[in-house]
């Protein structure tokens, strides 16, 4: 039904446009429209341009305010606050340029509409004007790029994130697995050739640092602790995306990527901030990796350091040998079934 209404409206507009063309052609052929009528038409079209301009700007402002509630909440990581500040600065610059250029464009179209008593002034160049609109954007863009690069260097510089807790995030179609280093805070080596049903990450059992590694299907993180996220993929390119922490890094088969960040807001606190008792942090795949890409996500839980230690203590090491059932007593007499 909605499609039919849309098609009817489009068809009606096309009919009106064609009728206007026919009417204009008839007027020109008959010589009925004089310069006074043309000037009137120009004034009307100019007024319509200004109406369209302000209606569009007001509607845009309304849409920004109306749908702001669907944006991400405050950043839940230390660097995320700085990233948001940089983004806000970009938005301010973009809105300023957008409003300025659109207002000038439509105002000039109205002010300098055709007038029989005025002739257009033509000039082929203006060095001063070209210098202004070249130098100013260059300075603004250079400032934005420089601040962005400096912040990115702070995020990726390993020397500024020493003594961080190592967590491996391992992606495959179509799920994530987390691996935690034990007390030594060192992840064991892994190799895809060692992957089995009982060793899905291919952890090298000969590496002593892996004896206390822990595997989990939920990503638990302690608040206020530097995290070194080690990212790997088994099959295709994935992308570990934690939107609430402003974190994203590709997971590429055959290589290891890393991301350093520090969570600053626990899950419980974010529930209070958002007013949503069911709020959960989540890690998504932000690369289209196959038919079930949309379902590739992992729950992320941020807790106090004491809670994290208690949770980690209750988890079993990934390479812990399962308990072996006691051997049958060979000296026991066989039991004869009752007849």
Where is each model-derived feature located?
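Hydrophobic alpha-helical segments
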Residues: 1-93
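Non-transmembrane, membrane-proximal soluble domains of secreted or membrane proteins
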Residues: 34-37, 62-89, 102-339
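Residues within alpha-helical transmembrane segments of multi-pass membrane proteins, especially transporters
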Residues: 10-14, 92, 96, 100, ...
